[in-house]
Curated annotation (Swiss-Prot):
Source taxonomy: Bacteria, Bacillati, Bacillota, Bacilli, Lactobacillales
Pfam families xref list: Ribosomal_L33
BP terms from Gene Ontology: translation
PANTHER family from the UniProt entry: 50S RIBOSOMAL PROTEIN L33, CHLOROPLASTIC, LARGE RIBOSOMAL SUBUNIT PROTEIN BL33A
Gene3D superfamilies reported in the protein's UniProt record: Ribosomal protein L33
HAMAP family noted in UniProt: Ribosomal_bL33 (MF_00294)
Name this polypeptide is given: Large ribosomal subunit protein bL33A
Keywords: Ribonucleoprotein, Ribosomal protein
Stored InterPro entries: Ribosomal_bL33, Ribosomal_bL33_sf, Ribosomal_zn-bd
UniProt family annotation: Belongs to the bacterial ribosomal protein bL33 family.
Superkingdom field: Bacteria
C-alpha cells in the first residue's frame, strides 16, 4: 500500500517535498538529502 508523505527540512522545519512510499516494504521513516530553498543548500529531509 502506497501512502503520501511530506519531507520536512531538519534544519529549518519547512515542508518542501511531497512523495509516496510503500509502507509495507519500508515501515521505517525516510531520511533523504534534498535541496532546501529556504536554506539555499542541501540538507537532510525527514518524513513527517
Amino acid at each position: 500500500m502506497r501512502v503520501k508523505i511530506n519531507l520536512e527540512c531538519s534544519e529549518c522545519g519547512s515542508n518542501n517535498y511531497l512523495t509516496s512510499k510503500n509502507k509495507s516494504s519500508h515501515p521505517e521513516k525516510i531520511k533523504v538529502p534534498k535541496y532546501c530553498p529556504k536554506e539555499r543548500k542541501v540538507t537532510l529531509h525527514v518524513e513527517t
